[in-house]
Amino acid sequence: MDPKEIIKQQRLFFSSGKTRNVDFIIDKLSNLKQKIIENEESINNVLYRDLKKSKFESYISEFGILISELDNYIKNIKKWSKRKKVRSSLLNFPSSDYIYSEPYGAVLILSLIHI
């Protein structure tokens, strides 16, 4: 598929609002984590072939960090995505002010696959 078409499809999907659902994000992150774990051996082989990284080094510098970050994100995303009350300015009195955390948009990551 053409990269321009992929970007177009991703922007359409983002504008649908589905990515604002925290449960949707958790599901996708869990799927990503599972796929990484399922393909660990293949990824280790590529890291050894291309960068001469041992399995231990691959785990320490690649898998361990990535899986830990995914676990942390899955665990905390509900808390991070809640609105946060902030102090109101005198100019806005009387008001209630909040910060809403929302996704910015779509990202396209291109990579060569050597599996």
Predicted regions and their residues:
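Conserved small/polar residues in nucleotide/adenosyl-binding loops
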Residues: 113-115
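N-terminal Rossmann-like NAD(P)+-binding subdomain of aldehyde/semialdehyde dehydrogenases
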Residues: 1-104
